[in-house]
């Protein structure tokens, strides 16, 4: 066997095993970075020797050529729907009808009712062959290439005890984390948002371009076996047992599946799942109850479009209609101006809802919503009330347009919206009371001016007692004034005032970071300081010049230009300089002195001779980028005392590791 063929085979088996542990057992056996390293190696080998690539290779999930349309597939046997019950009385009626026919010696296999898209997946000789949507139950759309991209679905079944042909039926879902990330990306681009994870999953599965599906992080859980050939193949005699067989073949099955032996146990299960609903990582709208004994299922049979032996026990409605009575505009800690709808209180999803976010002006325009409209409210993810649609034929003649404010409702500063962003923001910055507490907490934080003892609670009290309105006021505080704070005696107050005085002497990079300019983190602040060297040069720069700085793109450049164009922000800066905040002049550094330019370094553990922030600043002065985590792109890890997981990861990746003594030698 060719060396590449052997390694490709071994890597394919190894990665598929890790996928099984990750998606089926919910028990990852290797770090993500190690999985990525193995996958990268497999891609390299398959590129070199494509003739040796396996059909079940995880690289086959990236998506292929776009389709012109979806073909229709006739199901091997109909995919039926379920009847519903909505309360305990209706469930008891369902249970009575079952026991009247098969007696009381039965149990129920209970599982969450996933709110996704039902699909059929066919395996022939253990190899993934095709997949289709439920459609009308008789025929569905061929979504084989899209389903192939879902990482949790095995391309080859595990073991060798599966039938020659097996049909797996289950639900494709979009986890909450993936849904939120998808909508955040859409919101940032000003694109239409998905209303809920179910719509997102359905829309993702019906993409003609499977590469788009591959990017959507879909999940899958099997809920039943479909057709098995030959029919004589020995299967478990219970529904739960058959799900366990699916699990043993590497097919994901929900960990929430449980067998209940009585009506009381079923109700306990229902109530437990409903209580934990918001903590699950996927949307559910009830629980599915199936008679567990296969013999009973066969005896009970089917009605026209549903089995008699199963039902969906639905949760209370998550969508209701109500009246939009008005809109308030709230200002968040980053200045985001968010419209919040005031609603006629309505009970939905188990709680009374009286407010719902409208997100931004684009969302208001998309919905076409006005004050006075009857709207449909949904508890998205069981947590955040969301307006999903208006009821157009109920709009009154006196409905009023929702007008986005041009001035901040808190500080009267201009509300601005940067091109390419969906969110409007107050330009007041540190001047805006809504942003002030968080801004001053950031200003005093360890990575900014590092005022020892100036914690969040101290900042909140200083502002609540009107002792501080802007960062410059911190440097005017007296010990006697500080004793007005709770649990602050004269000794502690004197110590804190001394720490504030020490913080006056800082660095240009720390000062810039402390200002809290959007998207300007430590590394960007350091790059700005190194490039402009003086405050006057920075203040006089244009957006075009900001883009010339390392790691500064068009969006960050726009944030900088907007911040420095606001008189309020310039006044805050001038006041800080006036009270004595200063830093050493930055000298020109010759290119040959940037010995670490282009390198990425990480610090971990306790440094006993160097201050961590000083070490970081000195590394940056030599051109290095100092990161917070180890990756394959890390050039060197400095391991101090009691170094932990970062050191282990660096050793696994083969990253160069040095101690503090070696770092001192490099910096000296």
Swiss-Prot record:
One function term, GO molecular function aspect? DNA binding
Query: Catalysed reaction(s)?
Result: NAD(+) + (deoxyribonucleotide)n-3'-hydroxyl + 5'-phospho-(deoxyribonucleotide)m = (deoxyribonucleotide)n+m + AMP + beta-nicotinamide D-nucleotide
Lineage, top-rank taxon, reads Bacteria
Q: Where does NAD(+) bind?
A: 32-36, 81-82, 111, 134, 171, 290, 314
The question of whether GTP-binding is a record keyword is answered with: no
| UniProt keyword annotations, A-Z | DNA damage, DNA repair, DNA replication, Ligase, Magnesium, Manganese, Metal-binding, NAD, Zinc
Q: Which Pfam family, any one, appears in the UniProt record? A: Nlig-Ia
The record ties this protein, via Gene3D superfamilies, to: 5' to 3' exonuclease, C-terminal subdomain, 6.20.10.30, BRCT domain, DNA ligase/mRNA capping enzyme, Helix hairpin bin, Nucleic acid-binding proteins
One GO term under biological process is:
DNA repair
Sequence positions that bind Zn(2+): 408, 411, 426, 432
Q: Does the keyword NAD apply?
A: yes
Specify the BRCT domain's residue ranges.
Answer: 591-668
Q: What class of enzyme is it?
A: ligase
Give its E.C. classification number: 6.5.1.2
Give the record's family classification.
Answer: Belongs to the NAD-dependent DNA ligase family. LigA subfamily.
- Protein name stated in the entry: DNA ligase
Gene (name only):
ligA
